[in-house]
């Protein structure tokens, strides 16, 4: 038995088999054609209404002039349709050359690989073959020089052609040609047997436009060649492979605007939740426990703070009630006129409280100085020990600094002094300064009168009118008052209390709302504290 009997039948025929089958089909068609029909035009005189339309209607002749229609015998004169079909070409073996498709629009010298054998590397049979040897240095230099000259020539021609005005081309050297005429004789060629002709290139006009119009349409070159198919033929996919290749669409877990129906297994597979194990960190438990403990301690602290606040509020309330009871008891005793033995103690306690309050103010002042800015601190320390007269008497002239001790001259040469027994034994009378200090009119005017030079910018030109204006005049005066009394021009003046108003007010403050005045009198050392009041 032959080996071909075991092999399966081929699914495709080879090129030789296809050509043989085509030839056999053509021979069978020729054998089956029994009658060969040949069409001829009607004879002359019977061609009325006949119009030639096919090539067979013309026969072997040309057009019919008596028939006035467009005629194309042998398709002469007919416009051919444009077609991109290529003519079939065959190789020396008679096979169709399919590489003509890849060679369309390419030069004939271009190497195009269109066969499978072109991908297989050639086997080197002889390593010493001269065609396989690398060229030497001289050949490389020669080829390089030729390439450079050719490129320079091409580039120079294109650059010169693009320029509107160019220099004249360099003329070729003259050529000398020896000419021997065919007609020899005295009558011909001036009797000369030979002539030497000097051939010179004709000068070209640089501004001359081109004489010939080149409008040749060059066919467009083919695109990149198709990629060779290097994979096995496609085979039909099985149902299992089709199901495996079904990729679920990208559907969000929150939005599904198109309303796709996604199986739950596909959605979980796309989500990837089951691909990893969930591991809870132990720090979460520690954090929860710490938060619980902190919350419990905070609640306990709040509860204890609330209890302490309630206790303090209760004590404060009791203390306030006790104070109110004491004040009520003292008020009842004052209404009843009952003397208390603690009045003296209250006066001493009040003095101690005043001293304590003054010391507290001094300490507060020292703290403020320590916390103040450097510039402000220096200013406060400078004004701390100044005399009160320097602070308030801003208009006095600046006293000259001298090392001599100054005395009040009014204390000398007085009739009342240590030898006069202090005004007849009245040691409580304070009349040492019985006259005004520097009571001159000029000094009073300089202190209590604004300066024109300094205050003119503030008050303007009506300074005199403002000074003369009585700004502190009452609308309604007392009866019996002297309106013609001249106003004072000096400093503030004081007078003694002639009616004892200060004593009366002091007793009223001491007894408060008591109906019966107390028999106790003020101490003697406080008797003359309020004997002077301010006079305006």
UniProtKB/Swiss-Prot annotation:
Q: Does the keyword Transcription apply?
A: yes
Q: Which residues carry this modification: Phosphoserine?
A: 14, 182, 190, 224, 232, 234, 446, 479, 481
Q: Which domain of life is it from?
A: Eukaryota
A GO biological process of this protein is: positive regulation of transcription by RNA polymerase II
Q: Spell out the residue ranges making up region: SNW.
A: 174-339
Q: Name one Pfam family in it.
A: SKIP_SNW
Region described as Disordered:
1-44, 212-233, 311-386, 467-536
The location annotated for the cross-link Glycyl lysine isopeptide (Lys-Gly) (interchain with G-Cter in SUMO2) is 81, 97, 115, 122, 141, 158, 170, 193, 240, 258, 286, 339, 344, 416, 441, 452, 509
Q: Where is this region: Interaction with PPIL1?
A: 59-79
Which spans does this entry mark as compositional bias, Basic and acidic residues?
467-489, 503-530
Role according to the record: Involved in pre-mRNA splicing as component of the spliceosome. As a component of the minor spliceosome, involved in the splicing of U12-type introns in pre-mRNAs. Required in the specific splicing of CDKN1A pre-mRNA; the function probably involves the recruitment of U2AF2 to the mRNA. May recruit PPIL1 to the spliceosome. May be involved in cyclin-D1/CCND1 mRNA stability through the SNARP complex which associates with both the 3'end of the CCND1 gene and its mRNA. Involved in transcriptional regulation.
How does the record describe its quaternary structure? Identified in the spliceosome C complex. Associates with U4/U6-U5 tri-small nuclear ribonucleoproteins (U4/U6-U5 tri-snRNPs). Component of the minor spliceosome, which splices U12-type introns. Interacts with SKI, SMAD2,SMAD3, RBPJ, RB1, PABPN1, MAGEA1, SIRT1, FOXN3, U2AF2, PPIL1, DAXX and ATP1B4. Interacts with VDR and RXRA; preferentially associates with VDR:RXRA heterodimers. Interacts with NCOR2. Interacts with MAML1. Interacts with NOTCH1 NICD; the interaction involves multimerized NOTCH1 NICD. Forms a complex with NOTCH1 NICD and MAML1; the association is dissociated by RBPJ.
What is the recorded name of this protein? SNW domain-containing protein 1
| Species annotation | Mus musculus (Mouse)
């Amino acid at each position: 038995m032959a080996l071909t009997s075991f092999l399966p039948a081929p699914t495709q025929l080879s090129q030789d088999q296809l050509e043989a089958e085509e030839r056999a089909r053509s021979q069978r068609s020729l054998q089956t054609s029994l009658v060969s029909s040949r069409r001829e035009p009607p004879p002359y005189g019977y061609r009325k209404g006949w119009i030639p339309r096919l090539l067979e209607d013309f026969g072997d002749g040309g057009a019919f002039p008596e028939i006035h229609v467009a005629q194309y015998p042998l398709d002469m004169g007919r416009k051919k349709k444009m077609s991109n079909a290529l003519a079939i070409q065959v190789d020396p073996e008679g096979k169709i050359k399919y590489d003509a498709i890849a060679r369309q629009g390419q030069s004939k010298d271009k190497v195009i690989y269109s066969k499978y054998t072109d991908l297989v590397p050639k086997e080197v049979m002889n390593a010493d073959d001269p065609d396989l040897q690398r060229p030497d240095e001289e050949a490389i230099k020669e080829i390089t020089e030729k390439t450079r000259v050719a490129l320079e020539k091409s580039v120079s021609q294109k650059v010169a052609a693009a320029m509107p005005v160019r220099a004249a081309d360099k003329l070729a050297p003259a050529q000398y040609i020896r000419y021997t005429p065919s007609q020899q004789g005295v009558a011909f060629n001036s009797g000369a047997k030979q002539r030497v002709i000097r051939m010179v290139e004709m000068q070209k006009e640089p501004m001359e436009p081109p004489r010939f119009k080149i409008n040749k349409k060059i066919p467009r070159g083919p695109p990149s060649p198709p990629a060779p198919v290097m994979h096995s033929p496609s085979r039909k996919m099985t149902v299992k492979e089709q199901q495996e290749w079904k990729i679920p669409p990208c559907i969000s877990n929150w939005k599904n605007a198109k309303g796709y129906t996604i199986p739950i297994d596909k959605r979980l597979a796309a989500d990837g939740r089951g691909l990893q194990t969930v591991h809870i960190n132990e720090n979460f438990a520690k954090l929860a426990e710490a938060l619980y403990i902190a919350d419990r301690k905070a609640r306990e602290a709040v509860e204890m703070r609330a209890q302490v606040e309630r206790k303090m509020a209760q004590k404060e309330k009791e203390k306030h009630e006790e104070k109110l009871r004491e004040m009520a008891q003292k008020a009842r005793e004052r209404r009843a006129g009952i003397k208390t033995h603690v009045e003296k103690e209250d006066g001493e306690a009040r003095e101690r409280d005043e001293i304590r309050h003054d010391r507290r103010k001094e300490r507060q002042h020292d703290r403020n100085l320590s916390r103040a800015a450097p510039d402000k601190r220096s200013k406060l320390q400078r004004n701390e020990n100044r005399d009160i007269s320097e602070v308030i008497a801003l208009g006095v002239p600046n006293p000259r600094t001298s090392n001599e001790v100054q005395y009040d001259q009014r204390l000398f040469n007085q009739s009342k002094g240590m030898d006069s027994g202090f005004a007849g034994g009245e040691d409580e009378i304070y009349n040492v300064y019985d006259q005004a200090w520097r009571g001159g009119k000029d000094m009073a005017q300089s202190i209590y009168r604004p300066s024109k030079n300094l205050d003119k910018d503030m008050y303007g030109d009506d300074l005199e009118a403002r000074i003369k204006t009585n700004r502190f005049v009452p609308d309604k005066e007392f009866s019996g008052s002297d309106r013609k009394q001249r106003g004072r021009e000096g400093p503030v003046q004081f007078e003694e209390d002639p009616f004892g108003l200060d004593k009366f007010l002091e007793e009223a403050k001491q007894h408060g709302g008591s109906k019966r005045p107390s028999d106790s009198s003020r101490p003697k050392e406080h008797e003359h504290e309020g004997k002077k009041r301010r006079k305006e």
